[in-house]
Structures are given as structure tokens and as C-alpha cells.
């Protein structure tokens, strides 16, 4: 399911350009605070890649097959990526899961909702800050409370580069 959510986030980024004028942005500080508060709790798994980690990830992608057109386009999309945070808390006890969900909802309150997907009662919400003038979306958060999954992509992403990948 986590792979699906990551793929969904990257797939749906082009649709952010259709969002209304920005009502608010995702607060990196609030998101980091929630992740920091719960990262050492039982049943909570956190992966945090900062600037250096994402640079290494880009290097691995570049090294894997630089002659491949898809790889080059993925690198173009990733050039604005500054950090990735993933928190999975689906295996935590129910009361902790409810607290984490509540804190994440509070941290995302007022942020621009780019998209909400409902599937068999499960919701996946994608937040971010879109700028129609520059054709970019910044600081994207993917939140699936029923699955206990939260993904935060820090950086600025060009919608045109993402659209090229999606057209294939």
C-alpha cells in the first residue's frame, strides 16, 4: 500500500496545477514536529531523507541507467526534491494511531488540499502549495489516515516535467 501511495503522489502532482489559488501551505515545521514527537514510539516507522540523502538517491538513479529516457525524465522531476519524510504508524496501538492521526490533521489544517481520493471507504489526501504562474507545486504531503501512512516531499516540482513522465 505504501508503494501505491508514493506512486499516487507522484502521479497526481500534475493535477495540482488545477487547484484554486493557494489557501495555505503545508508547514514543514509542524509536520517535522509531529514526526519527531512520535518517531520513537512502538509501531511507528520513520524514514527521513534530508538534502544529502536525496542527493545520494538522485545519484543512484543517475548511475542506474543514464541513457534511458525515462531515467532522465525522472531525474528532471527529482531535481527540485530537497527531502523525503515517510511515517508509517499502521502497526501502532489504536489509541496511539488515533493521536498521531489527530496531530497530523491539526498540522495540515489550513493547508491547500490538492486532491482527495476515496476508495472503498479509505481516503488519501494530497496537500501542497501550487503556483499557477510558475507551474510548480511545493512541499507535497500525502496522508492516508486509515492506512496510518504519511509522506512529505519537500521541495519544488515542475508540473511540466511531471506531465512528460505521465504522458508515457
Region spans (language model):
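A recognition module on extended beta-rich or small alphabeta surfaces enriched in W/G with H and D/E
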Residues: 159-168
Amino acid at each position: 500500500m505504501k508503494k501505491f501511495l508514493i506512486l499516487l503522489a507522484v502521479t497526481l502532482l500534475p493535477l495540482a496545477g488545477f487547484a484554486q489559488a493557494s489557501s495555505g501551505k503545508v508547514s514543514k515545521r509542524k509536520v517535522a514536529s509531529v514526526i519527531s514527537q512520535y518517531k520513537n514510539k512502538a509501531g511507528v516507522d520513520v524514514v527521513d531523507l534530508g538534502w544529502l540523502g536525496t542527493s545520494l538517491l538522485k545519484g543512484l538513479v543517475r548511475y542506474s541507467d543514464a541513457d534511458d529516457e525515462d531515467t532522465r525524465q525522472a531525474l528532471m522531476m527529482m531535481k527540485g526534491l530537497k527531502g523525503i519524510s515517510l511515517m508509517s504508524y499502521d502497526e501502532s496501538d489504536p489509541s496511539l494511531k488515533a493521536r498521531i492521526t489527530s496531530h497530523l490533521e491539526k498540522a495540515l489544517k489550513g493547508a491547500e488540499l490538492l486532491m482527495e481520493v476515496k476508495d472503498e471507504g479509505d481516503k488519501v489526501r494530497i496537500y501542497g502549495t501550487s503556483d499557477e504562474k510558475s507551474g510548480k507545486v511545493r512541499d507535497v504531503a500525502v496522508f492516508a489516515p486509515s492506512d496510518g501512512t504519511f509522506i512529505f516531499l519537500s521541495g519544488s516540482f515542475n508540473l511540466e516535467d511531471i506531465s512528460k513522465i505521465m504522458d508515457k
